[in-house]
């Protein structure tokens, strides 16, 4: 039913005038996807409150976008979204951000073998981020370069060159693959600072005539707003170039960056631009996650009681949430009359999936949803903003029957429904679960949002964003 309605809307391309009442009704049909009633009753589990045809037609907008907000749930496959929704909202519930975008598709995401150029069906975050930031497929571990190690201009670099404000927000270290792909070009994602770059990416090192480590390239890229973790690497000392002998933090300050380290100092910032770009460093490494709970274990769903996730005491009021960082980035970037490009990453869905920690993973998905809500609130008021929500790769968690005797690691959770949901991680040994290669959900709202519908590839996202902003 959904697919036929989308096809009808896209094929007809008849955008008819609608009244304010019709618009309100259309928005409700598309966005309110909660179950309509008692799920034990006939029709109670239905999510549709009416025909979608007019609502979808009204959502189509082929005008250029002034702004783009791209939100990435790292490792957020369909299973991760469903598990988080079941736990936090219930089986008949819905996310007011992730589930509220009207136009939805699926995209493929594979890397390439560096030697043969053939598909590597399971991508890492570096190759996947390079795909949507440059439009180029590459090998796992590469950032901003192709399989021949040639650099390619990123969407952030293009936006900045066109006079747009730019932002890069993540709950990970800012040197981690997803944020780093916007601002760096290195042969290995491990090259965070000068010392490791000299060892693992010698061709990228400043002393060899390269562009430097990821952190040095981040400073050179000079996005207007950069927020996340990774303060530890900024304590490293430059080993070559103009800033040799100074720490990367000292370099940032000398080059005019305003550095903040907690929620209060972030909230106090009122301006950020090329004269005084904002650099938020809120953790030595990755930022603390929202929820705690036991990691999955062998037969954990059978041998241990179901648990309820608890708040992480390390994420106190001094640590800005992803929604708060998104809000501040939008507030600052939207002051540029030419528009802006902003990428926001909920990084630890992936990291907690690797650790087989369902509470950590679910809490980070809820965090991302709150950030999506903030982006949509701005986009609806602004009218010229394209919001896109997707992931970089799929991951290992699966929802299984509570009494399953699974071969992998499992943990049972008490959901909002008062029911038990078991999560299983079974594609790797106990130390770290691995990515998976199934296609991913991509959803959008605003100008050019229709270009995510149907089956696309991760590289299509780069061209969709480039065209929407009219970048050359």
Swiss-Prot record:
Pfam families in the cross-refs: Alk_phosphatase
GO MF term list: alkaline phosphatase activity; metal ion binding
Annotated coiled-coil segments of the chain: none
Superkingdom, natural source: Bacteria
Entry's family note: Belongs to the alkaline phosphatase family.
Protein name in UniProt: Alkaline phosphatase
Matching PROSITE patterns: ALKALINE_PHOSPHATASE
Amino-acid positions noted as binding Zn(2+) 2 in the UniProt annotation, renumbered to this chain: 74, 392-393
Subcellular location: Periplasm
Catalytic activity: a phosphate monoester + H2O = an alcohol + phosphate
Signal peptide feature range: 1-21
């Amino acid at each position: 039913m959904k697919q036929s309605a989308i096809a009808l809307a896209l094929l007809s391309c008849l955008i008819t005038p609608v009244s304010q009442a019709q618009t309100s009704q259309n928005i409700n049909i598309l966005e309110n996807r909660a179950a309509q009633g008692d799920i034990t009753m006939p029709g109670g589990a239905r999510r549709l409150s009416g025909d979608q045809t007019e609502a979808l037609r009204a959502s189509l907008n082929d005008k250029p976008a002034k702004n783009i907000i791209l939100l990435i749930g790292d490792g957020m496959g369909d299973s991760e979204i469903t598990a988080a929704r079941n736990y936090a909202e219930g089986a008949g519930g819905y996310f007011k951000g992730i589930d509220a975008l009207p136009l939805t598709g699926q995209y493929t995401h594979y890397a390439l073998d560096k030697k043969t150029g053939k598909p590597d069906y399971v991508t890492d975050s570096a190759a996947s981020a390079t795909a949507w930031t440059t439009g180029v497929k590459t090998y796992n571990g590469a950032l901003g370069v192709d399989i021949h190690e040639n650099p390619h201009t990123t969407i952030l670099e293009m936006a900045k060159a066109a006079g747009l404000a730019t932002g890069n927000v993540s709950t990970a270290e800012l040197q981690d693959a997803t944020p780093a792909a916007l601002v760096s070009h290195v042969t290995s994602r491990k090259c965070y600072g000068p010392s490791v770059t000299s060892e693992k990416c010698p061709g990228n090192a400043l002393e060899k005539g390269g562009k430097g480590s990821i952190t040095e390239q981040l400073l050179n890229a000079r996005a207007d707003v950069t927020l996340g973790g990774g303060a530890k690497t900024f304590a490293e000392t430059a080993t070559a170039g103009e800033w040799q002998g100074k720490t990367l933090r000292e370099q940032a300050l000398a080059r005019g960056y305003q550095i903040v380290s907690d929620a209060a100092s972030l909230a106090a910032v009122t301006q950020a631009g090329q004269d005084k770009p904002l650099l938020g460093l809120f953790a030595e490494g990755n930022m603390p996650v929202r929820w705690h709970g036991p990691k999955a274990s062998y037969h954990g769903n059978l041998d241990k009681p179901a648990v309820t996730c608890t708040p992480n005491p390390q994420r106190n009021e001094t640590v800005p949430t992803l929604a708060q960082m998104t809000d501040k980035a939008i507030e600052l970037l939207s002051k540029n009359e030419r528009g802006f490009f902003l990428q926001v990453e909920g990084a630890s869905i992936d990291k907690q999936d690797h650790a087989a920690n369902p509470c950590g993973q679910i809490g980070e998905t809820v965090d991302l949803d709150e950030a999506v809500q903030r982006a949509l609130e701005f986009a609806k008021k602004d009218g010229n903003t394209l919001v896109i929500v997707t992931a970089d790769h799929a991951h290992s968690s699966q929802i299984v029957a509570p009494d399953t005797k699974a071969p992998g690691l499992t943990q049972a959770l008490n959901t909002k429904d008062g029911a038990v949901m078991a999560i299983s991680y079974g594609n790797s040994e106990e130390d770290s679960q691995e990515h998976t290669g199934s296609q991913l959900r991509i959803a959008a709202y605003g100008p050019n949002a229709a270009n995510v519908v149907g089956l696309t590839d991760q590289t299509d996202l780069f061209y969709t964003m480039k065209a929407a902003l009219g970048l050359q």
